[in-house]
Structure formats: structure tokens, C-alpha cells
Curated annotation (Swiss-Prot):
It comes from Gorilla gorilla gorilla. The keyword 4Fe-4S does not apply. It is found in: Nucleus speckle. Its main location: nucleus. Residues 146-158 have a biased composition (Acidic residues). A motif (Nuclear localization signal) lies at residues 172-175. Its EC number is 2.3.2.27. One of its GO terms (molecular function) is ubiquitin protein ligase activity. Pathway: Protein modification; protein ubiquitination. This is E3 ubiquitin-protein ligase RING1. It holds the Pfam family zf-C3HC4_2. Residues 1-205 are annotated as: Necessary for transcriptional repression. Keywords: Chromatin regulator, Metal-binding, Nucleus, Phosphoprotein, Repressor, Transcription, Transcription regulation, Transferase, Ubl conjugation pathway, Zinc, Zinc-finger.
């Protein structure tokens, strides 16, 4: 022994220590007596019992198990190279389990996506087209009803099991509509798309809701598929151009969230955000400002400094600041514009993943509009 070291690549080393049958590292090595090929003991015994009486590598005749002999020297060599054999096998098992679980999740997601797409394609054939020149807004039934039911008074037709049924395409809006064509009616129905049953009664004056299976038109075959389900979704949050005053909520917000977030989550986030911004603006104002104004108008004899101090102490202190305890997702209603200048109310139970799948446009983020709800209750 002259101490010479020979460099061996991991690939060639692994090929020498690999069983040709199971393609894993040799375990309880058995060597054929004639051709000297090595196999795992369990692998070669199973092969011989199955009736294959030949060497799996060179096809030489192997009469029985007597044609094999154990090779403890090779097992000792493997234990020297890989002293932590059990740790290696445990790591390999963990990798296989993770790959199997990931593959199953991807298969489930693709199956659900394909099922939703097929349902949307079938439901598109049941959409009734509105009569030109009429003010009624016609929507598709949520599931069990006949296409001829509920064709009067411009009411939305929605199933009682709207949250459980898969969403369908939205109807086309009549061009010559009056009050019925606006996004929010002049009546007191403020929660249109949030509730399942009561919301459908008040949503007749809205441009269609997504609560009873009235989602937007399905993506045509061959169109680019939306982002991967369960991933992050980027959306643009704009104030409603018709329902929000110019100087009140003129801020466009850019939000990035997960696909399993619902429309109610967005409404609650928006209400909290606006309440916090108002609170910060009022707290950042000059102290005694509101009170000073009240004192100056009430007592003409008081000086500027004293009047301001007295007014700041006697005026309302905390009620002017918005409370965060009463913030609710029903304070704001979320809309989406499918096209043609029409706005559709989004149901609060819908996930952003489902909304993005129906209304996503290529190379553009999802755009939503918000406006204060007239009647939050």
C-alpha cells in the first residue's frame, strides 16, 4: 500500500453500489457464483421464486438459490462508505412521502378546476337573453328551477342553496335600462350580494349578483388558464365611479393576498383600513382645534388662547375618533365590472380564487370596486 488515493465520482460510485433490480443501494448483498453479479438478497430470491431462473444482468442460468452466495465483504465496504445508512433511508422515505403528497394535491386541484370549467360550459347554454328595450334584469337559476320560472317584475332568480351550488355565468345587461340598469338600486336594498335569501330580494335593481350562481361568462376553450389555484392574487381596489364621491374615497389601493380569501375578508380589511386612516388623520391634527372652534363661537369675551383651551377641554374628546370595535364587513360592498360599463355585486362568501378564475384578464391584475353600503344591517 503506497497511500495512493483514487478519486471516484458519486455517480459511478452509486452505480457500483446499486442493485440492478430495485435500483437502490445494496442490502444483504448476494453474489452469483458463476458471473459474480451482485443483488440484494430479497430482490434476487424474489426473482428466482417468480420462475425467472437466470441472472437479471447477463441472463446466465441460475438453477436455484444454491447458485448464490452471501458477500459480507461488500456489505462492510458499503457500511464504511455510508456509516449512517438508516439516516439515508429515512431521508429517502421522507422525500418520497413529500413527492406523493404534492402529486396528489396537484391532481386534486386540477380535477376541481376541470369540474368547475365543465359546469360553467354546461350552464352557459341555459342563460336566457333579456328582451331588448326592457328594464328587467334576468339572471339564471341557481340549480333546480325551470328556465321559465320567475320571468316577471325584474327579480333575480336564485336558488335557496346558492352558497353550495357552483357559480354560473352572469346575464347580459339590457342597454336601454333605467333604474334597473344601475349598479345599486334607489331602494333600501344595500346588502344585495352578501346574503343568500334576503339579498336576492333586494338585488333586483342591481346589475346582477354573484350569490345565486350568477358569475361572469366562462372562459372559452383555448383561452389562457388563470393563475394556479391556491396561489397569491394581485388585485387593484378602486372606488366605485358612480357611488363614491370624488373627494371622499379617491384612493386606489393595490392588494396582494391568497386565493382562499373571500370577498367578506376584503370588505373587513377595507373597513378597518379606512377607519385607521381616519383615526390617524384626526390624531395627527392640532390639539384643541375642534374644541377651540366651538369655544370661539360660543363666548365672544374669551381670548384666543383661553377660548381654545376651554373649548378643547369641554368639547367632545373621543367620540370624534372612529371606533374599531364596530367595524364590519357589511359596511362596504364590493363590485366588479365584467364589461360594457356594468357593475356586478360580489357575494361575500365567494373566494378570490373563484372570482379570479371567472373574471381574470390576460396580463392584467384583477380589478374590483368598492362603495359604502347604504344599509349595513
Amino acid at each position: 500500500m503506497d497511500g495512493t488515493e483514487i478519486a471516484v465520482s458519486p455517480r459511478s460510485l452509486h452505480s457500483e453500489l446499486m442493485c440492478p433490480i430495485c435500483l437502490d443501494m445494496l442490502k444483504n448483498t448476494m453474489t452469483t457464483k458463476e458471473c459474480l453479479h451482485r443483488f440484494c438478497s430479497d430482490c434476487i430470491v424474489t426473482a428466482l421464486r417468480s420462475g425467472n431462473k437466470e441472472c437479471p444482468t447477463c441472463r446466465k442460468k441460475l438453477v436455484s438459490k444454491r447458485s448464490l452466495r452471501p458477500d459480507p465483504n461488500f456489505d462492510a465496504l458499503i457500511s464504511k462508505i455510508y456509516p449512517s445508512r438508516e439516516e439515508y433511508e429515512a431521508h429517502q422515505d421522507r422525500v418520497l412521502i413529500r413527492l406523493s403528497r404534492l402529486h396528489n394535491q396537484q391532481a386534486l386541484s386540477s380535477s376541481i378546476e376541470e369540474g368547475l370549467r365543465m359546469q360553467a360550459m354546461h350552464r352557459a347554454q341555459r342563460v336566457r337573453r333579456p328582451i331588448p328595450g326592457s328594464d328587467q334584469t334576468t339572471t339564471m337559476s341557481g340549480g333546480e328551477g325551470d328556465p321559465g320560472e320567475g320571468e316577471g317584475d325584474g327579480e333575480d332568480v336564485s336558488s335557496d342553496s346558492a352558497p353550495d351550488s357552483a357559480p354560473g355565468p352572469a346575464p347580459k345587461r339590457p342597454r336601454g335600462g333605467g333604474a334597473g340598469g344601475s349598479s345599486v338600486g334607489t331602494g333600501g336594498g344595500g346588502t344585495g350580494g352578501v346574503g343568500g335569501g334576503a339579498g336576492s330580494e333586494d338585488s333586483g335593481d342591481r346589475g346582477g349578483t354573484l350569490g345565486g350562481g350568477t358569475l361572469g361568462p366562462p372562459s372559452p376553450p383555448g383561452a389562457p388558464s388563470p393563475p394556479e389555484p391556491g396561489g397569491e392574487i394581485e388585485l387593484v381596489f378602486r372606488p366605485h365611479p358612480l357611488l363614491v364621491e370624488k373627494g371622499e374615497y379617491c384612493q386606489t389601493r393595490y392588494v396582494k393576498t391568497t386565493g382562499n380569501a373571500t370577498v367578506d375578508h376584503l370588505s373587513k380589511y377595507l373597513a378597518l383600513r379606512i377607519a385607521l386612516e381616519r383615526r390617524q388623520q384626526q390624531e395627527a391634527g392640532e390639539p384643541g382645534g375642534p374644541g377651540g372652534g366651538a369655544s370661539d363661537t360660543g363666548g365672544p369675551d374669551g381670548g384666543g388662547g383661553e377660548g381654545g383651551g376651554a373649548g378643547g377641554g369641554d368639547g367632545p374628546e373621543e367620540p370624534a375618533l372612529p371606533s374599531l370595535e364596530g367595524v364590519s364587513e357589511k359596511q362596504y360592498t364590493i363590485y366588479i365590472a365584467p364589461g360594457g360599463g356594468a357593475f356586478t355585486t360580489l357575494n361575500g362568501s365567494l373566494t378570490l380564487e373563484l372570482v379570479n378564475e371567472k373574471f381574470w384578464k390576460v396580463s392584467r391584475p384583477l380589478e374590483l370596486c368598492y362603495a359604502p353600503t347604504k344599509d349595513p344591517k
